[in-house]
């Protein structure tokens, strides 16, 4: 969730958006949790690891793809021209450590093969499982970049969307 607050006592929080489609909060929380633990030097004080969000996150990704016949997970992110601080890249980079067989790709390097009616990466490797850190509402409205084709042109050739299209109804700002 993204909120704003006026700072005036008694004023309510205002909800700006619900980030159901691009859930980076768990990644950010795991990093903050681990960083805080290290900075406080809790291990030197005899405390075991405090909080296990990151470990649980990693283990769940491994469970999800353990039984996959095509376990490659493509992690799509926007390029530097859209995200100059590379926040999205860094988030998918962290997910890459959780899943076992991953490939990070800029979303503009997802290619539609007219002959096979399927999606692939720039190396020609088929995309069967895709996590994209790019809002669905932008995909469906961005005909200039061609990203909208991911949804409308042979959407079914990608077997597993980690964050499926129905999530756009929860997070849509249009």
Q: What spans do the regions from the language model cover?
A:
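Domain-scale recognition of functional cores that engage charged ligands
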Residues: 4-9, 24-174
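Short hydrophobic beta-strand that contains or immediately precedes a catalytic carboxylate
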Residues: 14-19
């Amino acid at each position: 969730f993204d909120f704003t607050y006026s700072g005036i006592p008694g004023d309510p929080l205002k909800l700006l958006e619900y980030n159901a489609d691009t859930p980076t909060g768990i990644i950010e929380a795991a990093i903050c949790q681990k960083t805080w633990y290290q900075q406080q030097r809790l291990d030197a004080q005899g405390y075991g690891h405090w909080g296990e969000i990151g470990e649980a996150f990693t283990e769940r990704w491994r469970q999800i793809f353990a039984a996959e016949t095509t376990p490659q997970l493509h992690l799509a992110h926007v390029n530097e021209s859209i995200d100059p601080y590379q926040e999205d890249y860094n988030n998918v980079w962290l997910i890459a450590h959780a899943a076992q067989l991953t490939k990070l790709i800029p979303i503009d390097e997802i290619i539609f093969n007219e002959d096979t009616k399927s999606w692939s990466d720039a190396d020609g490797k088929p995309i069967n499982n895709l996590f994209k850190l790019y809002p669905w509402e932008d995909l469906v409205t961005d005909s200039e970049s061609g990203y909208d084709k991911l949804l409308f042109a042979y959407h079914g050739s990608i077997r597993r969307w980690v964050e499926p299209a129905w999530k756009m109804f929860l997070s849509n700002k249009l």
